[in-house]
Amino acid sequence: MVTSAGVGHAEYNNGADVQHADYAHLTSVGQVEQKPLGGRLGALAEYYKPNVASMEEYRAMHAQSITDPAAFYGERARTYVDWFRPFDAVFLPGPDGRPSFDNNAWFVNGQLNACYNLVDRHAARTPDKVAIIYEADEPGEGYSLTYRELLAQVCKVAQVLQYSMGVRKGDTVAVYMPMIPQALVTLLAISRIGAIHSVVFAGFSSNSLRDRINDARSEVVVTTDESKRGGKIIETKRIVDDAIKETPQLRKVLVYKRTCNPSVSYVADRDLDWDTEVKKYKSYCPCEPVDSEHPLFLLYTSGSTGAPKGVQHSTAGYLLQAYLSMLYSFDVHSDDIFFTAGDIGWITGHTYVVYGPLFSGCTTVVFEGTPAYPSYSRYWDIIDKYSVTQFYVAPTALRLLKRAGDSYVDGYSLRTLRSLGTVGEPIAAEVWEWYYTVIGKREIPVIDTYWQTESGAHLVTPLAGGSTPMKPGSASFPFFGIDLAILDPQTGEELLGPNVEGVLAVKQPWPSFTRTIWNNHDRYLDTYLNPYKGYYFAGDGAARDSQGFIWILGRVDDVVNVSGHRLSTAEVEAAIIQESMVAECAVVGFADELTGQAIAAFVVLKQKSSWNTASERELQEIKKHLILSVRRDIGPFAAPKLIVLVDDLPKTRSGKIMRRILRKILAGEADQLGDVSTLSNPGIVKHLIESVKF
């Protein structure tokens, strides 16, 4: 069992402030009454008929997705997915006839190809429709690709991978690229030939990249010479070169020249130039049929034990659930312009920059830059310039833009928007209100989504189009296929009814649920399925209020969420402890106004007396050195915001570090520590409290 650490410290609004978005209001507990659409949505209502029209329809669909998943998913898989060979069964049933975590497989014996469903069929039906709008870091440097052009580029790169680099069906290919169209082309080319892509966020250090390449056993890497972000140059090729010094299986590197910097070094017979290679091949090659359960990609995510986990997703189940979330969560139609301000190095970019939008046949916006460059108006400029219909972004960016001021929004109409999404972390009520009021003009619904790398698509979310009500800060209701439960963290018993708080779990698998951890199925079981037998344990605390709304309360394991990025505290601790001056270290998360959570490291040095007598300047140099160690080992985004040098750490008599005490002190709750007399060193608590200075 896991403990309830972290649960119960978040505030949630139990029953008030239900928002109408000018389309629905709550009349009693659990009941929603519809009223006519108003404002901009009302003007579009006839043209954009909602994919889910009412709360009643949502309830009926959700019930079917849980009680009769064969009918719910079977009908949609036959309707929306193009198959090379039809499936024999929707899922492999467990002993009770329902989907089972013990043998989770969907669309049994079916064959398909992800790239065909994302590109080929649209290139055949709507070849001149824009598939990708590229907004480069520097305004005015972007361009667009139609589905016809995208197909040609994908086929050429697929042949480069096959014939110039020797990639075969089932091989893993590492991808370390910025947010440019060639990154999407690469992912599609890999899936076209039946290989498996393993994208590593291009902000990770060479050490982190090395570890992921080795764990995935990738023999090929695709990267760029450099990348540009926020007006700055990032040396991606140099990072790759450093990483593969310790990847003995690595054979080839494909390099797209983003900046064409002549000083970037290349290794003969290993490094291939993108432009030179694609010229060798024709603009079409056939797709490789793969089984429904064939791995589509690996995506590494932080775990509480420190070593990153290669979360493996299947092809058919992931594609269908990703598309259904586009269809229902965002009410997407095929002529929409979908803008996710996320990176393909994370699951948000996989599902809502690449697979969801392109499967839907709509247009996806690929943004290379940051929300603040060259000004805080950058997002709003993109939305107006390209007539964006759905916008999806992390609360961290919204906090930054809210702080910058409403003047940066002035002058932008944002009139084409039909839904505003948030992703990666819970959104504070005041930020939700700003987003809804200043950006949405109190007419556009805020789709506050909760999901994970492991889930592949949404777990809890409102639905755009008018069917479900909203409440600031709540993720609302379970998505289709999600049989959600809130469990008592100690007993594992389900807490039924309203006004309950515990750990979030799911009772049965859904099509896009991860199948395993690459090369480590035992860890998969221990992390997700063994903590509470019969359930998927999501690792987050949750509450259900009096009206049935779900509130996400944050992690209950040793994972910190910084700007929507999950980081293992153990991984950060390892980066600090490797320094010869460090004896012990404990890393915890604490609340941060901008990033949601930030990282604090409590560090015990080997020479305790030396830092007690050191000058303030010397202490700052020690702290800078430790922060640099984390930046170098993991990446800049993982750098601790606070380093606290201490004489000792709070420990039980068995030697376990009590991180709960550190979290309480950082939260200003030193008066709520409870009985500390059982610590092996209770006197250290006063020292810790006095040492924390923001």
Curated annotation (Swiss-Prot):
CDD domains hit by this protein: ACS
Keywords for this protein: ATP-binding, Endoplasmic reticulum, Ligase, Microsome, Nucleotide-binding
Annotated positions binding CoA: R229, G230, G231, K232, T348, S563, R631
Binding-site positions, ATP: G424, E425, P426, D448, T449, Y450, W451, Q452, T453, D540, R555, R566
Molecular function GO terms recorded: acetate-CoA ligase activity; acid-ammonia (or amide) ligase activity; AMP binding; ATP binding
EC code: 6.2.1.1
InterPro entries referenced in this protein's UniProt entry, alphabetically: Ac_CoA_lig, ACAS_N, AMP-bd_C, AMP-bd_C_sf, AMP-binding_CS, AMP-dep_synth/lig_dom, ANL_N_sf
A Gene Ontology cellular-component term: endoplasmic reticulum
Main location: other
Motif Microbody targeting signal per UniProt: ranges: 692-694
GO aspect biological process, one term: acetate fermentation
Top EC class of this enzyme: ligase
Entry's family note: Belongs to the ATP-dependent AMP-binding enzyme family.
NCBIfam families with a match to the protein in the record: Ac_CoA_lig_AcsA, PRK00174.1
Protein name, entry field: Acetyl-coenzyme A synthetase 1
Gene from which this protein is expressed: ACS1
